[in-house]
Amino acid sequence: MAKFNWDKLLHTSWLYTKIFFAVLALCVASYVYGTYKPNESAISKVNEELDIFYMNEIKAMDLQEPEFTYNNDIQFVRAMHKCINFINFTLPKDKRVPYEMIIGQAALESAWGQSRFAKEANNLFGIRTWNKDTPHLLPQGVTKWRGWGVKSFASKCDSVQYYVDLLNNHSAYKEFRELRQKMIDKNQMLDALQLIKKLDKFSTTKDYDARVARMI
């Protein structure tokens, strides 16, 4: 009968023990690294969950739309700021539109809130409707429906909300959304002047982006 080799057994056991603890150490290190130094995907997921929680909390507060009153250009800008702040409370960060862009376009389209459509229809952006049954105004001098009208809103802040929704959802502004997302992914501030260039579908005016930019 062969003699049992205890030395070989002890050597093999010690080798496997070292391997076990080495693997265990790697697992612990990986766990610690992943816990205290999460990757970008983990950070993004946490931020997304926080945004959802934050949005739900804000909605539960049932905030009321701010009053939109003004007598001059400065007051118009202040009223716009209050309205945009109110809208942003209910929007995730990646769905927001720069203040300068919204105010610049509203100022251009509504003559700083002094246009007929702004005063009578609360429409600050000249947004149209092609549905005759939708509340609307016809252009000055037009008495019959010609296939479109300027949409009427319950309030001026309501028209701002509609404008933001339009940029966030309409297929015509896909390039705007893509550029905004690129800026967000690079942790850059949203560049209103660059984003305005993606509004070419909003108006048939060739230099529309330049006109909006001059209002900023």
Question: Model-predicted segments: where are they?
Answer:
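Catalytic cores of secreted/periplasmic lytic hydrolases that degrade extracellular macromolecules
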Residues: 2-103, 108, 112-216
